[in-house]
Amino acid sequence: MKIGKQSAVLKNVYLGETAVVTGPKEKNGPLGRHFDKTYDKLHCNAKSWEKAEMQLLRDAIEICLEKNGLEESDVDYFIGGDLNNQLVIGNYVLREYKLPYLGVFGACSTANESIIVGASLLEAKFGRKV
Protein backbone atom coordinates (compact mmCIF):
# COMPACT_ATOMS: atom_id res chain seq x y z
CA MET A 1 0.00 0.00 0.00
CA LYS A 2 1.39 3.37 -0.98
CA ILE A 3 1.79 5.93 1.78
CA GLY A 4 2.80 9.48 1.09
CA LYS A 5 4.42 10.38 -2.21
CA GLN A 6 7.26 7.87 -2.36
CA SER A 7 6.83 5.16 0.26
CA ALA A 8 4.99 1.86 0.45
CA VAL A 9 4.14 -0.65 3.14
CA LEU A 10 4.38 -4.31 2.14
CA LYS A 11 2.72 -6.87 4.38
CA ASN A 12 3.45 -10.27 2.85
CA VAL A 13 7.17 -10.07 2.13
CA TYR A 14 10.15 -11.49 3.96
CA LEU A 15 13.78 -12.28 3.23
CA GLY A 16 14.18 -16.05 3.37
CA GLU A 17 17.94 -16.29 3.02
CA THR A 18 21.01 -14.52 1.70
CA ALA A 19 24.38 -15.52 0.30
CA VAL A 20 27.47 -13.32 0.38
CA VAL A 21 30.64 -14.18 -1.53
CA THR A 22 33.67 -11.89 -1.39
CA GLY A 23 37.30 -11.42 -2.25
CA PRO A 24 40.27 -11.06 0.10
CA LYS A 25 39.77 -7.43 1.11
CA GLU A 26 36.30 -8.08 2.49
CA LYS A 27 37.47 -11.34 4.02
CA ASN A 28 40.19 -9.53 5.95
CA GLY A 29 37.82 -6.79 7.13
CA PRO A 30 35.78 -6.65 10.34
CA LEU A 31 32.89 -8.68 8.87
CA GLY A 32 35.07 -11.33 7.24
CA ARG A 33 33.92 -14.20 9.42
CA HIS A 34 30.27 -13.61 8.51
CA PHE A 35 30.52 -14.23 4.76
CA ASP A 36 29.34 -17.49 3.19
CA LYS A 37 32.38 -17.87 0.95
CA THR A 38 35.55 -15.88 0.44
CA TYR A 39 38.40 -15.99 -2.02
CA ASP A 40 42.03 -15.43 -1.07
CA LYS A 41 42.96 -13.99 -4.46
CA LEU A 42 41.62 -10.69 -5.77
CA HIS A 43 40.56 -12.22 -9.10
CA CYS A 44 38.87 -15.18 -7.36
CA ASN A 45 41.10 -17.61 -9.26
CA ALA A 46 39.75 -16.28 -12.58
CA LYS A 47 41.64 -14.72 -15.51
CA SER A 48 39.88 -11.33 -15.52
CA TRP A 49 37.79 -9.04 -13.33
CA GLU A 50 34.69 -9.91 -15.32
CA LYS A 51 35.22 -13.65 -14.93
CA ALA A 52 35.84 -13.11 -11.22
CA GLU A 53 32.54 -11.24 -10.92
CA MET A 54 30.82 -14.06 -12.77
CA GLN A 55 32.24 -16.61 -10.33
CA LEU A 56 31.12 -14.53 -7.34
CA LEU A 57 27.57 -14.43 -8.73
CA ARG A 58 27.53 -18.16 -9.54
CA ASP A 59 28.69 -18.97 -6.03
CA ALA A 60 26.08 -16.68 -4.46
CA ILE A 61 23.28 -18.26 -6.51
CA GLU A 62 24.35 -21.81 -5.64
CA ILE A 63 24.77 -21.03 -1.93
CA CYS A 64 21.42 -19.26 -1.72
CA LEU A 65 19.61 -22.12 -3.43
CA GLU A 66 21.31 -24.62 -1.13
CA LYS A 67 20.61 -22.65 2.06
CA ASN A 68 16.93 -22.43 1.10
CA GLY A 69 16.71 -26.06 0.03
CA LEU A 70 15.54 -24.97 -3.42
CA GLU A 71 16.04 -26.18 -6.95
CA GLU A 72 16.19 -23.79 -9.90
CA SER A 73 12.65 -24.81 -10.84
CA ASP A 74 11.37 -23.56 -7.47
CA VAL A 75 12.38 -19.96 -8.23
CA ASP A 76 9.75 -17.76 -9.87
CA TYR A 77 12.07 -14.84 -10.68
CA PHE A 78 15.75 -14.01 -10.34
CA ILE A 79 16.21 -10.27 -10.01
CA GLY A 80 19.61 -8.65 -10.01
CA GLY A 81 22.13 -6.56 -11.79
CA ASP A 82 25.63 -5.21 -11.68
CA LEU A 83 27.44 -1.91 -12.02
CA ASN A 84 27.78 -2.28 -15.77
CA ASN A 85 24.85 -0.67 -17.56
CA GLN A 86 24.60 -3.58 -20.00
CA LEU A 87 24.20 -6.07 -17.12
CA VAL A 88 26.92 -8.18 -18.71
CA ILE A 89 27.83 -10.25 -15.66
CA GLY A 90 24.24 -11.13 -14.79
CA ASN A 91 23.34 -11.90 -18.39
CA TYR A 92 26.31 -14.21 -18.91
CA VAL A 93 25.85 -16.07 -15.63
CA LEU A 94 22.07 -16.43 -15.88
CA ARG A 95 22.43 -18.10 -19.28
CA GLU A 96 23.71 -21.10 -17.32
CA TYR A 97 20.56 -21.36 -15.21
CA LYS A 98 16.91 -22.04 -15.91
CA LEU A 99 15.82 -19.03 -13.89
CA PRO A 100 13.53 -16.28 -15.20
CA TYR A 101 15.89 -13.29 -15.07
CA LEU A 102 14.85 -9.69 -14.61
CA GLY A 103 17.89 -7.44 -14.91
CA VAL A 104 17.92 -4.16 -13.00
CA PHE A 105 20.36 -1.31 -13.50
CA GLY A 106 20.58 1.59 -11.12
CA ALA A 107 24.36 1.79 -10.59
CA CYS A 108 24.82 2.05 -6.81
CA SER A 109 21.09 1.61 -6.20
CA THR A 110 20.86 -1.69 -8.12
CA ALA A 111 20.71 -3.86 -4.98
CA ASN A 112 17.97 -1.81 -3.36
CA GLU A 113 15.99 -1.48 -6.58
CA SER A 114 16.19 -5.25 -7.06
CA ILE A 115 14.83 -5.81 -3.56
CA ILE A 116 11.98 -3.37 -4.19
CA VAL A 117 11.06 -5.05 -7.49
CA GLY A 118 11.19 -8.51 -5.92
CA ALA A 119 9.19 -7.44 -2.88
CA SER A 120 6.57 -5.86 -5.13
CA LEU A 121 6.24 -9.08 -7.16
CA LEU A 122 5.78 -11.06 -3.95
CA GLU A 123 3.30 -8.60 -2.47
CA ALA A 124 1.23 -8.70 -5.68
CA LYS A 125 1.37 -12.53 -5.57
CA PHE A 126 3.04 -12.80 -8.98
CA GLY A 127 5.39 -15.37 -7.45
CA ARG A 128 6.31 -17.13 -4.23
CA LYS A 129 10.09 -17.45 -4.56
CA VAL A 130 11.95 -14.44 -5.91
Residue ranges with predicted function:
Residues 1-102:
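Conserved "HGTGT" condensation-loop signature of ketosynthase/thiolase-family condensing enzymes
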Residues 105-130:
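Active-site-proximal alpha-helical scaffold in enzymes
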